[in-house]
Regions:
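Acidic/polar, glycine-enriched structural segments that form the non-catalytic walls/loops
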Residues: 1-182
Length: 182
């Protein structure tokens, strides 16, 4: 089943959520030798550059972002966790609108590190998240299974996230370390 999704929450200059039509000059390339994905696009006349890497031996990704949208507060990272339902497939597998039947909690491990704990019946898994740079981490609402990582006062930002069956700390690695291993 789907463990969760990680994405960007993008805001237009007026503070409303951006849609795909608001993005310009979108381009994405994958280096077939290393597996690194390079993405770029524009929003609010500002360029966004993203580098995504995947660990070869762990369920871990690393993401580096360069954009003034971070500094403006118009770009954040979300982590969203569904209720597993293999029969429901609209955009992603799972029900993101189902609040009951599963729990999502988080604990702060260090100033730039949290661990999200997921529970569904007898199933437990963990999603530790580390980042570099100033940011706030919060739950979107008490009932939601969505968490927001909001970079502050920076135009460059990176984070790593891992999915693990064990509640281990220090499971993530810096983006550059993951990239060297790929």
């Amino acid at each position: 089943y789907n463990l969760g999704r990680i994405g960007f929450r993008l805001l237009r200059e007026d503070g409303t959520e951006a849609r795909e039509i608001d993005l310009g000059n979108a381009r994405q390339e994958i280096d077939l030798w290393t597996g690194v994905v390079y993405s770029r696009f524009e929003l609010n006349r500002k360029e966004v550059k993203v580098r995504t890497v995947c660990h070869p031996d762990k369920d871990m990704i690393g993401v580096s972002i360069e954009s003034e949208l971070l500094n403006d507060g118009n770009m954040s990272i979300y982590l969203d966790f569904p209720y597993p339902d293999g029969r429901y497939f609209k955009h992603y597998i799972g029900r993101y609108d189902t609040i009951s039947g599963h729990t999502s909690t988080f604990e702060k491990l260090a100033p730039n590190s949290v661990r999200i704990t997921r529970t569904m019946d007898d199933t437990h898994y963990y999603a530790p998240l580390d980042w570099t740079g100033p940011a706030t981490f919060s739950r979107e609402s008490e009932k939601a299974h969505t968490f927001l990582l909001q970079p502050r006062h920076t135009s460059t930002f990176s984070f790593t996230c891992c999915f693990s069956p064990e509640p281990v700390a220090d499971v993530t690695e810096p983006v550059a370390s993951i990239e060297r291993k790929s």
